[in-house]
């Protein structure tokens, strides 16, 4: 059995969030929480919210035990980019892409200790 949570259209670059997600993949729920709590990256806040949502889904919807949960899979997909114009010299303009992310965390339950 597995529980899943997704945060879509999060306004942070996928490249930056992947650095954080790579830290928790395969870890136990408690260890992942501790890692995210002390990770000094903006993406850690968003990943922590998705992790807590997945944990709540596991306990409330799938009757899984919280102390047995681990991060089975965690990945970040790219969402649509917001295009913004940056005026430049001589009447030109550059396009700035404000990137968005879809953050997915899947928790599994370990059997036996």
UniProtKB/Swiss-Prot annotation:
Disulfide bonds: none annotated. It comes from the Bacteria. GO terms for biological process: translation. The keyword rRNA-binding applies. The keyword rRNA processing does not apply. One of its GO terms (molecular function) is structural constituent of ribosome. Keywords: Ribonucleoprotein, Ribosomal protein, RNA-binding, rRNA-binding. InterPro entries: Ribosomal_uL22 (IPR001063), Ribosomal_uL22_bac/chlpt-type (IPR005727), Ribosomal_uL22_bac/org-type (IPR047867), Ribosomal_uL22_CS (IPR018260), Ribosomal_uL22_sf (IPR036394). Belongs to the universal ribosomal protein uL22 family. This protein binds specifically to 23S rRNA; its binding is stimulated by other ribosomal proteins, e.g. L4, L17, and L20. It is important during the early stages of 50S assembly. It makes multiple contacts with different domains of the 23S rRNA in the assembled 50S subunit and ribosome. The globular domain of the protein is located near the polypeptide exit tunnel on the outside of the subunit, while an extended beta-hairpin is found that lines the wall of the exit tunnel in the center of the 70S ribosome. Part of the 50S ribosomal subunit. HAMAP family: Ribosomal_uL22_B. This is Large ribosomal subunit protein uL22. It comes from Thermus thermophilus (strain ATCC BAA-163 / DSM 7039 / HB27).
